[in-house]
Structure formats: C-alpha cells, structure tokens
C-alpha cells in the first residue's frame, strides 16, 4: 500500500511535465481527463476553485507477474575432509581470539577499577592527614590561648596582691605615725 501511494505521488509529479511534453509533440488536443499507466489509471473527476480531484484506479497484477520467482541458489560443492577441518580450525581460532579479547577487556576493566580504588584510598588518607593536622594546630592554638589567659589571670591576681600589700603597709605606717 505504501509503495502504491509513493508511486502515485511520483506519477502525479510527472503528470504536469508529461502533459507539457506531449503537447509539444502532439499539437492536437488530448483527452486530459484520463491517464493510463502500466499498473494504474488516473481520471480527472472535476476542477474546483480549491484544486483538482482525481480518481485513481489500480489495476490487478498481471498473471505473468504472479508466477513465483525463484532465485537459483549457488550449487554447493562437496567439501573434502581437509576443507572441513580447515573451517573448523578457523572457527576455533576465531573463538579463541574472541575469548582472548573478552579476557583482555575484563583485565583492563579490573585494572581501571583497582586504580580508581587506589586513588580513592589515597585521597581519603590525604584528607584524614589534613584533618588531623588541622585539629592538632587548632588544639595547640587553644592550649596557647588558655595558657595566655591563665598567665593574665595570675598576673592580675599578683597585681591585686601587691596592691593589697601596699595598702596594708600604708595603713601600718598611718597607724604608727598617728599613734
């Protein structure tokens, strides 16, 4: 059906060109209402302002073409034992080659997976080392800050102690002078 529709489209494209060429060779007017081809007939139904209408009549296939066409297959020659053996050996070689290729691909895939895993482990170790170093550095800073704060507190306490000792001494001097 699709082939017939395609053939119809091609014939319709050729139709106007065909009528032009025919008018050059045959100056007398032709009946343009009917066109006949090998396997179809096209009749013009009527002309309209919007276009033209055609009736397409498909002819049944001719009885000659109905005969089944059988293609003569090439005659098979008798194969000798040596030829059969050669074909079997060639097939075995192909099988071994394919098997070796599959094994090679699997080995390459495993190697790639191993490399990816190794790289991931190295990155994980590097990350762990960097995190540990950052943590140690942070702990050292906290320890230094704590020691600095403790030293500042001790300094303030010692300053208060000196001030208290000075106040006591001044008080004792006042008591001695007044007394």
Curated annotation (Swiss-Prot):
Q: Where in the cell is the protein located?
A: Cytoplasm; Cytoplasm, Perinuclear region; Cell projection, Growth cone; Membrane
- PANTHER family named in the record: STATHMIN, STATHMIN-2
In residue numbers, the region (Regulatory/phosphorylation domain) covers 39-96
What does the entry report about post-translational modification of this chain?
Sumoylated.
Q: How does it sit in the membrane?
A: Peripheral membrane protein
**Native organism taxonomy:** Eukaryota, Metazoa, Chordata, Craniata, Vertebrata
**Species:** Homo sapiens (Human)
Q: Which InterPro entries match?
A: Stathmin_CS, Stathmin_fam, Stathmin_sf
The record places the lipid (S-palmitoyl cysteine) at 22, 24
Q: How does it assemble?
A: Interacts with MAPK8. Interacts with ITM2C. Interacts with KIFBP. Interacts (via the N-terminal region) with CIB1 (via C-terminal region); the interaction is direct, occurs in a calcium-dependent manner and attenuates the neurite outgrowth inhibition of STMN2.
**Gene Ontology MF, one:** calcium-dependent protein binding
Q: Where is this region: Membrane attachment?
A: 1-26
UniProt keyword rRNA-binding present: no
Pfam families reported in the protein's UniProt record? Stathmin
SLD domain residues are 38-179
Protein keywords: Cell projection, Coiled coil, Cytoplasm, Endosome, Golgi apparatus, Lipoprotein, Membrane, Palmitate, Phosphoprotein, Ubl conjugation
Tissue specificity comment = Neuron specific.
Record function comment: Regulator of microtubule stability. When phosphorylated by MAPK8, stabilizes microtubules and consequently controls neurite length in cortical neurons. In the developing brain, negatively regulates the rate of exit from multipolar stage and retards radial migration from the ventricular zone.
Sequence positions bearing Phosphoserine: 16, 50, 62, 73, 97
Q: Which PROSITE patterns match?
A: STATHMIN_1 (PS00563), STATHMIN_2 (PS01041), STATHMIN_3 (PS51663)
- Please provide, in alphabetical order, the Gene Ontology terms of the cellular component aspect for this entry: cytoplasm; cytosol; endosome; Golgi apparatus; growth cone; lamellipodium; membrane; neuron projection
Query: What family does this belong to?
Result: Belongs to the stathmin family.
Q: Which SUPFAM superfamilies match?
A: Stathmin
Q: What's this protein's name?
A: Stathmin-2
A single GO BP term for this record reads:
neuron projection development
Where exactly are the transmembrane stretches of this chain? none
Using the record for this protein, list the coiled-coil segments as residue ranges, or answer none: 75-179
